[in-house]
Amino acid sequence: ASPLRDVYKRQSIPLLGVLLFTIVPLVYMICIAFTNFDHNHLPPGSLFHWVGFSNFGNVLTGRMAGSFFPILTWTLIWAVFATVTNFFFGIVLALIINTKDLKFKKLWRTIFVITIAVPIFISLLIMKNLLAPGGPLNEMLMNFGLTNHPLPFLTNPTWAKVSIIIVNMWVGIPYTMLVSTSIIMNLPQEQLEAAEIDGASKFQIFKRITFPQILIIMTPTLIQQFIGNINNFNVIYLLTGGGPDNPNFYQAGSTDLLVTWLYKLTVSAKDYNLASVIGILIFTLSAVFSLLAYTRTSSYKEGAVK
């Protein structure tokens, strides 16, 4: 009984932490989604009460639908582009650095890894200042006569979305490059040499051997990155703050993701009920995609067979 009691004591503190900081806030958020707890019903001046599923109806089919679905669409577009570009260009960079004839391979790896060593919020704030209307990049372009006016990198909706994706590539590609490099360096050399002897081109070797090996190992990571990009608060908020403003959206800008919109609904608008609904929908979207995607991976199928 004594060893068992010791186990309970050791597990009680972590379980208490999970209860207080994960389960209780989650249950509280779910409950708030079924109330009218917003800026018009803030205790103690005004009490809120249960309203059932009306908040969900408001977001999905009511006046908030005009904001929710465009933001959801941009969130998914952003997540796809952010994940695919980092994966593709990370592999390309790894292949270039691992070319046999390339000199100073360690130096090139170190240069690209420096972006990982720098805290991401510092990189994003530097990029924000660099791309600002009066920033160094616009000043340089105008000094060289390439443009007569500052380019709207962060102030035009389309330019801002493209800029965000490019900046995210700068931050994320080195990580994919490192993982891909480790996979490439551990590929069976006998298999590669046999393919070369059989007359396979470099592209055929990449298509039939290298890329499938990278994809099998990195598929769970890609799923995780996609979900992470759906909830990528830092890149959007630190770079554009969700802007530029969009008069057609409620408390949201043209580059806001669902997660940054949720933040604004909570902190700025104090519409806690709507924010809770958005939080539940984000969780549902992420959970369903993760489950469907992971059950189709080779890792899951091999584990299921065993």
Roles of regions detected by a PLM:
Residues 5, 10-306:
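A structural signal for multi-pass alpha-helical bundles of membrane permease subunits
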